[in-house]
A protein has these predicted regions:
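First exposed extracellular module after export/assembly in secreted or surface-exposed proteins
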Residues: 15-135
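Bacterial signal peptide processing site
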Residues: 8-11
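C-terminal motif of bacterial Sec signal peptides marking the signal peptidase cleavage site
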Residues: 3-6
Length: 135
């Protein structure tokens, strides 16, 4: 699930989307029980971030333990395809992650990037580490 907030006009930002890691919670997650919540901020000068086609994914989260990529869809953020600068936050939820080795706890972090309708790929940000523990 992805939630978003705020749009503003600013001519000093790039048409290539830019993202910034804000937070990841909880710091310790129970395996298969606790959801992992990540917040990133975004800016995009021409407002073409997001897509209304339900078959197009444009937000990607890579689990650095095993290379599994979670794919999300950001809905179109500007009304009627207007070219306006936008900025805000995305809340990303990863449901109940598991331990991928034979230990009783494991650290994990994620790499995240977005793409826009113009084919521009944002910078990639890395989250801080959290620990997943057996229940």
């Amino acid at each position: 699930m992805v939630l978003l907030f705020s749009c503003t006009k600013d001519d000093t930002i790039s048409v290539v989307p830019t993202i910034e890691f804000k937070s990841i919670t909880p710091s310790i997650a129970q395996e298969y029980i606790d959801d992992i919540n990540i917040i990133i901020s975004y800016t995009d000068a021409d407002g073409d971030l997001g897509e209304n086609n339900p078959d197009v994914y444009n937000l990607f989260v890579l689990d650095n333990r095993n290379g599994i990529e979670y794919k999300f869809r950001i809905p179109e953020l500007t009304p009627n395809g207007n070219e306006i600068a936008i900025e805000g936050n995305f809340n990303i939820k990863i449901n109940g992650s598991g331990i991928t080795n034979s230990s009783t706890s494991q650290q994990v972090n994620y790499d995240i990037y977005v793409t826009d309708r113009g084919g521009n790929v944002s910078n990639t940000v890395s989250t801080s580490y959290i620990t997943i523990e057996e229940e």
